[in-house]
């Protein structure tokens, strides 16, 4: 019965909207409170602002009054959609808010012509994995997620440096 009461209450008080960079500080505070969610170097304000501008309207915020209680970063590369940092305030978990944010992300991805989405869930995040399974996501087999930092190993190629490497100085 409690879940039904909370869900009915949520429909009247929880509002969702587009994630704005002005929401960044509150979103980070929420990310820190959600078990299993890791904040990485690419989650700084400048990087998130760039992500939001490349993927307008896809990332979502859920508020209860003026308090942010849910966040999802969503984008695509033109072929596949990606959902990053889905987070729901622990007090609101189990109310359907996470699924609601995912559905809104999917709606935006469909509108953009994207047919498939991918998420990464940490191996040790059992609760997160169970959430995604309940949302009908499946683990992909036959692939391993791999990554590498893109760091400058040499100075950027300026016109002067390009010319000097060609012997055209």
Residue positions per predicted region:
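A short beta-loop-alpha structural element at the N-terminal edge
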Residues: 13-27
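Helix-loop element at the rim of GNAT/NAT acetyltransferase active sites that forms part
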Residues: 18, 28-42
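Active-site rim helix/loop that mediates acceptor-substrate recognition in acyltransferases
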Residues: 37-61, 65
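Conserved beta-strand in the GNAT
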Residues: 61, 67-75, 82-87
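A conserved beta-turn-beta hairpin within the catalytic core of GNAT-like acetyltransferases
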Residues: 75-84, 93, 139-143
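Conserved acetyl-CoA-binding loop-helix of GNAT-fold acetyltransferases
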Residues: 94-107, 134
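Conserved GNAT acetyl-CoA-binding A-motif
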Residues: 109-121
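Conserved beta-strand-loop-alpha-helix junction that forms the acyl-donor binding cleft
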Residues: 119-128, 147-150
């Amino acid at each position: 019965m409690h879940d039904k009461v909370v869900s009915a209450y949520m429909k009247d008080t929880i509002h969702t909207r587009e994630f704005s960079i002005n929401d960044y500080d509150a979103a980070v505070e929420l990310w820190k409170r959600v078990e299993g969610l890791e904040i990485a170097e690419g989650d700084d304000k400048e990087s998130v602002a760039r992500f939001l501008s490349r993927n307008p309207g896809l990332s979502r915020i859920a508020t209860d009054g003026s308090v942010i209680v849910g966040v999802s970063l969503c984008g695509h590369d033109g072929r596949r959609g990606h959902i990053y940092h889905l987070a729901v305030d622990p007090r609101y978990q189990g109310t359907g808010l996470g699924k609601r944010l995912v559905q809104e992300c999917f709606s935006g991805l469909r509108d953009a012509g994207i047919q498939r989405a991918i998420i990464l869930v940490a191996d040790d995040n059992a609760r997160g994995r169970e959430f995604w399974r309940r949302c009908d996501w499946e683990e992909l087999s036959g692939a391993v997620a791999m990554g590498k930092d893109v760091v400058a190993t040499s100075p950027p190629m300026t016109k002067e440096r390009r010319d000097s490497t060609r012997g055209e100085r």
